[in-house]
Amino acid sequence: MTSFSTLLSVHLISIALSVGLLTLRFWLRYQKHPQAFARWTRIVPPVVDTLLLLSGIALMAKAHILPFSGQAQWLTEKLFGVIIYIVLGFIALDYRRMHSQQARIIAFPLALVVLYIIIKLATTKVPLLG
């Protein structure tokens, strides 16, 4: 297995874990389950997300693809999508109760729609806006 395929595997597993954890945490929060505020929910997701970020940066370096360049407009769009996904996930989980329950319920499926767009950009490498 090459280092690129190893990095790609780590990246894909991190994506699956990150989305699974977001979904689980949202469901626990929505059900008002005591585990929603457990210590592991504050430790594990940031570790997984950091691994996801680092593997993504390593993949960009290994493939010699840079965002904000003419050849990789899809990657630029993907990065903006990731930022939108993070904001929507933050609203959906909102532990500080800054947003209403309705806003959280709307933000979660929107985050999943943005995730779908990110996956389409990554697999097709065809920019949506370009």
Swiss-Prot record:
Domain of life: Bacteria
Ranges facing Periplasmic side: 1-9, 60-73, 125-130
Gene Ontology CC: plasma membrane
Positions on the Cytoplasmic side per record topology: 29-39, 94-104
Pfam families: SirB (PF04247)
Cellular compartments annotated: Cell inner membrane
Keywords of this entry: Cell inner membrane, Cell membrane, Membrane, Transmembrane, Transmembrane helix
Membrane association type: Multi-pass membrane protein
Family stated for the protein in its record: Belongs to the SirB2 family.
Protein name, as recorded: Protein YchQ
Organism: Escherichia coli (strain K12)
